[in-house]
Amino acid sequence: MTVLEDIVAGVREDLATREAATPLAVVKEQALARAGAKSAVDVLRREDAIAVIAEVKRSSPSKGALADIADPAGLAADYEAGGASVVSVLTEQRRFGGSLADLDAVRAAVDVPVLRKDFVVSPYQVWEARAHGADLVLLIVAALEQTVLTSLVERVHSLGMTALVEAHDVGEAHRAIDAGARVLGINARNLHTLEVDRATFAEVVGVVPDGVVKVAESGVRGPHDVLEYARAGADAVLVGESLVTQGNPRGAVADLVAAGAHPALRAVRH
């Protein structure tokens, strides 16, 4: 069993428990009672700068425990104050230490769009994301059959949210586009080895249509990586580990945002 398969198996078990406790009909009522989702495409595709998606992330399969985040709302507020365009919240519990309670806390704390980052395999989780205030939902191509991926993209968009569809290679990028992705995440982390190769972004981005927002995921350790991804064609970067493992997340986000707005990138962006 691969790392991804193991994670998804656990996700399905936890999902079954939640479905038994809260039927889909109830979750749908909660979702439809929410105010409309915030638009994410425009904040991720800016003419003047690279957008930063800052992540609330306690642990990961590759590194184990990263940070003891006692106050996810406070961390998210720091991210927003530092200039983050979107806040990402891990809600997978077993490997990443996240929860829907974290999503609730972050949603209440910030005005920027919020991404639910999880291993979504069922429409229930999409409705659940909206019920808890998410504006974007991560969908991982490698975890989904094409018909399921397409159906989930359509469901996310039908609820006014934005699907961030994640690919790891050219083939997955084509699948994401065929499924209707408007925002494509290109993850530099190999799902089998968990190693990061930032060259993956440059290899994949060439097949992505101009109208699709391109998000570079994994491997952002500092401002120089933002510049590298921007020069390769990224519209946004998603950053987690490097923000939660040092003492000044607000300042760290501000540094990444400043790099994304560097004058040297203007010629690249136009």
Curated annotation (Swiss-Prot):
Protein keywords: Amino-acid biosynthesis, Aromatic amino acid biosynthesis, Decarboxylase, Lyase, Tryptophan biosynthesis
UniProt enzyme class: lyase
Enzymatic reactions: 1-(2-carboxyphenylamino)-1-deoxy-D-ribulose 5-phosphate + H(+) = (1S,2R)-1-C-(indol-3-yl)glycerol 3-phosphate + CO2 + H2O
Sequence similarity: Belongs to the TrpC family.
HAMAP family xrefs: IGPS_B (MF_00134_B)
Name of the protein described by the UniProt record: Indole-3-glycerol phosphate synthase
Disulfide bridges in this chain: none
UniProt gene name: trpC
